[in-house]
Amino acid sequence: MSDDVTPIRQQYLEIKRQYPDTLLLFRLGDFYETFDQDAEIASRELDLVLTSRPIGNGLRAPLAGIPYHAIENYLARLIDKGYHVAICEQIGDQPAKGIFPRKVVRVVTPGTILEAGLLPVNSNNYLASIILQEGRAGIAYVDISTGEFAVTELDAPAGSSPASLNQDFGPIRAELTRLRPAEIIYPDNLVLPDGIPGHITAWPAWRFEPGKCQETLLSHFGVSSLEGFGLQGKSLAIRAAGGILQYIKETEEAALPLLSGLRLYSLSEFMTLDAATRRNLELTETLRGELRGSLLGVLDQTVTPMGKRNIRQWVSQPLLELDRIRKRQDGVEYFVSHSMPRAELRAALKPLSDLERLTNRILSGHAQPRDLVAMRETLTNLPKVQQSTKGSQAGEEELLPTSTFLPIFDSCSDELNMLQSSIDDDPPATLQNTGVIRPGFSPELDGVIQASSHAREWINNLEPAERQRTGIKTLKVGYNKVFGYYIEISQGQAANAPSEYIRKQTLVNAERYITPEMKEYETLVLNAEERIREIELRLFREVCSELMKSARRLLDTARALAELDVLSALAEAAALGSFIRPMVCEDNGLDIRDGRHPVVEQMLHGERYVPNDITFEEGEAIRIITGPNMSGKSTYLRQAALITLMAQMGSFVPATSATIGMVDRIFTRIGAQDEIHAGQSTFMVEMIEVANILHHATSRSLLILDEIGRGTSTYDGVSIAWAVVEYIHNHPQLRAKTLFATHYHELTQLADFLPGVRNYNVAVTEADGNVVFLHKIIPGGADRSYGIHVAQLAGLPRPVIQRAAEIMSELEKSSGQAVRINPQSAQQVALFPETNPLIDELEKLDMNSLSPIEALNILFEWQRHFLDKKK
């Protein structure tokens, strides 16, 4: 390395070489500086001024800086754009000679965020890893802000080849769509399937080597075998979990203690919902990305951050275990039938902070004084939460048998007592300022503070005392960082300075002095400030260390509070929406009476919603539903799926009664708007989704099929739709419960020879030429589509409506034969009046600039134009 390069430049280059793929924030005093290409990126992405800094040998390097106190705001913008940011800090004290030692203390990536201000409040911030090998996959995910760590293995779809998996592995896409990870890491020698969501980070393949990953897991958990985690023989799960731990060690090592457990889960524990179904049913967000209008938007009545994350998971993962479903229902039912305890519980939960993330910030060493204040206030409210679940405040005679279906939790009284005695009521935001520790907690700290206070008081009284003693009215006591405290006397009275004053500085208009006694008190004050800061930092860390010992109890309490919040929230939603408890059972039936769409009903704002039954009778497998657009077919289909899903997540449902046979998967084929931009036609997208359904549905699945075959010609569409219905009906391992909405009236003939098919239609009434949609599903096929009426409601121009009616009349007369439209009626219909070019010319004329002769010439041309048209 050249001797001409400055020491700071040398240090920077050495550190940057270790983190070449990151944007390096290099601490220099009160700023984080970026250099070279990093500076150009920071300037562009953060709207920073791009300057330069000398680097030796007459050269300068691009430079852009961020104030250290504002780093969180800038960091958020960089992470949101997918950058990995290495934070390099000054370590220890500056040596007498040379520069500060510096090191990278963490690398912040989209999946390794711990800053409260950067984390999504109502959802998890997952980091995921993927391994693919020989038709199988391993997925691990972790949220370092909550300590959640889980892993699974996925089987390939039946009939898939390893080559095809790298192009389209549906189960991976479905699981990652559920998780919505902020970042995904994978071996850099792997080709990922298309459509994987989130920021993607390729990592060296050797990091995922089986032996290395197993050793990483054994070392992290301090065990000699992974059998206790259920990972024996699951090499892909081990590689995914071990790889993600190594990534966290490289980026945010302080987060490793947060990961105290690893949960192996199977997709067979939960209802399968592929990406298309989650999107079509708008479970957690609408097609526009909004919460309002989604199922979660209706059900999420939670009042704590932990509860909001938890209810999102419940909506995203309906259960397949009957006992767990019924236990959740029992909790919801208690709060539905006990409205006063529900209200008291929700009031007690509302002030709570995010205990789960607060605990993990303490464990990671990122906690600040106000985090402990938030924890103290949360723990203070726990007795109220416990009391509200007993019903005694509401005058209930019975005590809630919490051990049966409600989570129980510790009041954490020891932790609360420690926080109450140690942390000040209103501490500073950061540990860089004093005032963190409550007076009386530490005799040592109190003594230093008292001595400092006495010294400050002496210095504060020095000016009036010396003025009176010396008689010098211009005498002042001041302070600066160069000389410390000093006595200043104007030049006119400097000759009267006492002999014990020691001259320190001469100014144009004044002399400055010090005294030995003043310097002693100055030393007491200045040393005391640093001493107080050191003692408070040590005590704060000791308090955090004690809380770390209680981390498991605190986290268990946080998760119990989250579950209580969700149960009471579902009860609140049930009360607001007049939901009932469904009967979930192991058979294959579906009987919903007076079912309603939970979202559409809420959007009606008090208007009457027309309920419908969804009852599959003995031997019935497929309902073919015909009827006009805008009549409610799609709403009917979706409400069947949503009611089933709500029942299996443990919620009450919008109906007067409901018996739900356990459904293993819900599939939907509704629309193709999201994939057209990827280069696939609407019809191709439709056929791919139908193929996926037919390959993976089982006899316990629920299929929602809307307008199969509409993306091609009528004959092709009818043929494909017909064949799909036959396949579902006749396949010995399929015959799934199916709701099939269609405009192809020919499909109603299937009920004549397929015993499991039934026809239904949407009731319509006509009066005085007007059509009224009754939104009621009734037996039988529809006799007309009423499409022209829908077009009229949509506001098409009257000439189009009239012309469509004429053509419809001709088509109906043809009785299915080739139609010859009357030439006279086939003339082009003018939808809008044609604009006369002379009018356009008149509008453009500038009358103020025309001469009389020019105006006469224009009139002559117009006259000739009209005369020519008459000929």
Locations of the language-model features?
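Amphipathic alpha-helical transducer elements in NTP-driven molecular machines
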Residues: V5-R9, L25, Y32, D36, ...
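Extended, charged coiled-coil "arm/hinge" scaffolds of SMC/Rad50-like chromosome-maintenance ATPases
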Residues: L507, E511-S545
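Charged catalytic and DNA/RNA-contacting regions of genome-maintenance
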Residues: M1-Y334, A343, K350, D354-L363, ...
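ATPase nucleotide-binding head domains, primarily ABC-like/P-loop NTPase cores
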Residues: D36-Q37, K234, V303, R312-W314, ...
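Extended, charged helical/alpha-beta scaffold domains that provide interaction surfaces
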Residues: I8, N460, R467-Q491
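Active-site phosphate-binding and catalytic loops of NTP-dependent enzymes
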Residues: C88, T112-L119, A255, S392-P401, ...
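Terminal-proximal interaction/regulatory segments of ATP-powered molecular machines
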Residues: N480, E843-K871
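Charged, surface-exposed helical/loop "interaction arms" that form contiguous linear patches used
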Residues: S364, Q368, T378-N381, L400, ...
